[in-house]
Amino acid sequence: MIFDTHTHLNDKQFDQDREEVIRRAKEEYGVSWMLNVGFNRETIKSSIELAEKYDFIYSAVGWHPTDAITYQEEDLAYLRKLAAHPKVIALGEMGLDYHWDTSPKEVQAHVFKEQIRLAREVQLPIIIHDRDAHEDVIRILQSEHAEEVGGVLHCFGGDEAIMEAALEMNFYIGLGGPVTFKNAKLPKEIARLVPEDRLLLETDCPYLAPHPYRGKRNETGYVRLVAEQIAELRGIPVEELARITTDNAMRLFRVSV
């Protein structure tokens, strides 16, 4: 049983074979639960629709930093309403992205802070997108008291110091495809160091496919390859890692089955 804590199965890349991808993940790779993440008004809607269709798929709703420029003040009320949906178990993804120059940094920060405040109001954990913005992400999480709700730094790309700062605020560390890349020294180091009770597995599919599918469309079933790599790095059976990380996901997102 594996919990893939970050998917985008509503992405157009899956329009031709979405049901088959989900079936394959369940039956061939042992993925029992998936958290599908919406990141703007369009993808939030389709993410919830997908979660309503499958009892083992949940949804997160939020505004991605690269889409922050599209955020309107009325969207906060929209997110607040959706936070009460029974299949919505987290807010996000939210955060900062300094790699893609699509939204000004000050706009990203404003939208990020608004979502953290909403998460504290509705008491849902948050999913953090952090690209080339580690220090600013941690600073905002600290200043906005994100420790009150916790969450996950998805597709974690920071170093040990950033990891420790996140752990101090009740956050989990999400690891995906990059940990399988041959020269990915830092992700492999983090995979060894993160405490077992704070580790989550993810794919970010259709993006960031693990080896040997790097550069191709990622699938949620490939989270099994991520689990195998991390289990090898930590020197434990993959079944044990799957159990540990699934328990962690259930605890963070308050999912009971």
Sequence positions of predicted segments:
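Mid-domain alpha/beta scaffold segments of enzyme catalytic cores
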Residues: M1-V257
